[in-house]
Amino acid sequence: MDMNTFPANTYCDSIVRFLDAIEYHDDNLTHDERVEGLRHVHSRTAQYFTEPLPRKVLKDVAPRRIAAVTRTISHFIVYCWSKLPREAQVDVSIYLSIINVLDDEISSEPSTQMATFWTDLVQGKQQKHPFWVLFNSHLPRLLRHYDSFCSFNIMRCTFDYFEGCWIEQHNFQGYPGADCYPLFLRRLNCLGGAVAGTIFPAAKFDEQKLFAEISCVMAQIDGPVALVNDLFSFYKEYDQDEANLVTNWCTVDGITMDQALTRLTDDTIHACVRILEILKDKDPDMLATIRGFIHGYVTWHICDFRYRLREIYDREDLGGSSAKFRDYFDTAINVGWVDVEEWTCQVQGFEVDGPVPKGSEIQAYRTNAFGFSVDTRRPHNMDYVGSSIISMFEWVTGYLKGKSR
């Protein structure tokens, strides 16, 4: 699609309508709490990637990609899993970082490496695909924070995510009339089950006592996790020729992008309002946890400028809800913005092109995103890889020593 045809006013109205519906007000953390959480979670997540197994498995992955992932995911975890104990936050951050670092590996045809997957799994043999090699090592570390039902859902969702990426690498948008396909694929790869599983640690939630409530969250959570992301991604993905929920709807249902945006907005509002309404007279800690996730999720999207909402903010041709959109944007930035220098390590070799940018610019456009601006023209030889990882390790070690004093 041509960005010149982007329905900016309609999109502005959609964001405002959604934020009005959930009564957006992120009071999860103070600024100092965000900084402390980001420093701890990021340093420990970065440290994981200096360990022997991930270094071996990821030897061909550019270090700046790993650095970008660890920054993004640390930011995501601290803002959305804000009520999780710190060590559980670290292990969830590592879990999602592995997924994002290896996304390209899943998106290349995995059939050969997966040929003996189930036999190897049942017989306890070494897996062949790098995704599962790393997860076989990390999952026990993650699951120790959770009881059996939440652990089961984390595992289920991990399998679902891999399958969703396997399907997506074919860039198949579904046949006309296959109306179940778009949401089927979106549920597979949205990681809703992992969110619901990891957000209720055994230390804070009695799984047996709250089994019905947790089961209900498992059923409802895919909508908030997937659709909020799709709504905030609508602008940046408008001119990209990629299969996603919105373009898949257009393909299978024969609707326009404007109609798809209206559907997406309505469904996002319904999903978020419904889960909060269901929980409002249930366990108060569970309600606070889900509300905190949704509101933190909004803050994270607005503070991650890869979603390019600043471009909407700066447009001079907006009417209607533009003033309220800007108010919400300013509120989220005031609550959630933390300059990258306050919490993350600087790693040799991760420079960006052009003049030396300020930390906010680095965070916004280069290092704090799920889509990575890696300079693929530059060869990543072993000296470069080694020195970059060593620099990261030295920074992390120094930081942890300082914390232990």
Curated annotation (Swiss-Prot):
Originating gene: pbrA
Binding, Mg(2+) 2: N229, S233, E237
Superkingdom assignment: Eukaryota
Role: Terpene cyclase; part of the gene cluster that mediates the biosynthesis of the sesquiterpenoid aspterric acid (AA), an inhibitor of dihydroxy-acid dehydratase (DHAD) effective as an herbicide. PbrA cyclizes farnesyl diphosphate (FPP) to produce (-)-daucane. The cytochrome P450 monooxygenase pbrBB then converts (-)-daucane into the alpha-epoxy carboxylate intermediate which is further converted into the tricyclic aspterric acid by the cytochrome P450 monooxygenase pbrC.
SUPFAM superfamilies: Terpenoid synthases
Domain remark from Swiss-Prot or TrEMBL: The conserved active-site motif D(D/E)XX(D/E) is required for coordinating the divalent metal ions that stabilize the PPI moiety of the substrate.
Sequence positions that bind Mg(2+) 1: D103, E168
Alphabetized InterPro entries for the sequence: Isoprenoid_synthase_dom_sf, TRI5_ascomyc, Trichodiene_synth
Use case: The fungal sesquiterpenoid aspterric acid (AA) is a submicromolar inhibitor of dihydroxy-acid dehydratase (DHAD) in plants and is effective as an herbicide in spray applications.
Cofactor: Mg(2+)
Upper classification of the organism: Eukaryota, Fungi, Dikarya, Ascomycota, Pezizomycotina
Keywords: Lyase, Magnesium, Metal-binding, Virulence
Binding-site positions, Mg(2+) 3: D241
Family, per entry: Belongs to the trichodiene synthase family.
Pathway annotation from the record: Secondary metabolite biosynthesis; terpenoid biosynthesis
Short motif WxxxxxRY motif, span: 316-323
GO biological process, any: sesquiterpenoid biosynthetic process
Leading EC class: lyase
Molecular function terms from GO: trichodiene synthase activity
Motif NSE motif per UniProt: ranges: 227-237
Motif D(D/E)XX(D/E) motif in this chain: 103-108
EC number: 4.2.3.-
Identification of the protein by name: Terpene cyclase pbrA
